[in-house]
Amino acid sequence: MAIAKEDILAAVEGMTVLELNELVKAFEEKFGVSAAAVAVAGPAGGGAAAAAEEKTDFTVVLAEAGSNKVAVIKAVREITGLGLKEAKDLVDGAPKPVKEGVDKAAAEEAKKKLEDAGAKVELK
């Protein structure tokens, strides 16, 4: 019996970020592909038009953990759903992205939680 797309999506939905990363690496090895985004050249002379568009996807970057690292680790776990070890490794490895490709409201919310915990955060 074939696995339905819904079953696959349900399984992926229940995975942690670390498990998803391992899954992507397995796909890359199995099928000989790369998950890197392909850069598409923009239209020539479109600088003014691009500036007029508002950015919709944001990356929340933990620039520095600050003095209260425990609170920052708790905030990272709350935002990402990572386990304790993964969250600690992320905080220890700062600067690192905490969330990628999120909308402005979610990025601002994550930034506020991290800053309230004592971290220095950048939105890109």
From Swiss-Prot:
A single GO BP: translation
Stored InterPro entries: Ribosomal_bL12, Ribosomal_bL12_C, Ribosomal_bL12_C/ClpS-like, Ribosomal_bL12_oligo, Ribosomal_bL12_oligo_N_sf
Pfam families, A to Z: Ribosomal_L12, Ribosomal_L12_N
Keyword annotations: Ribonucleoprotein, Ribosomal protein
CDD domains noted in UniProt: Ribosomal_L7_L12
GO cellular component, one term: cytosolic large ribosomal subunit
UniProt-recorded Gene Ontology molecular function terms: mRNA binding; structural constituent of ribosome
N-terminal signal peptide: none
Keyword Ribosomal protein carried by entry: yes
Function statement: Forms part of the ribosomal stalk which helps the ribosome interact with GTP-bound translation factors. Is thus essential for accurate translation.
Record HAMAP family: Ribosomal_bL12
Matches recorded under NCBIfam families: L12
Protein family membership: Belongs to the bacterial ribosomal protein bL12 family.
Subunit structure, as described in the record: Homodimer. Part of the ribosomal stalk of the 50S ribosomal subunit. Forms a multimeric L10(L12)X complex, where L10 forms an elongated spine to which 2 to 4 L12 dimers bind in a sequential fashion. Binds GTP-bound translation factors.
Name of the protein in question: Large ribosomal subunit protein bL12
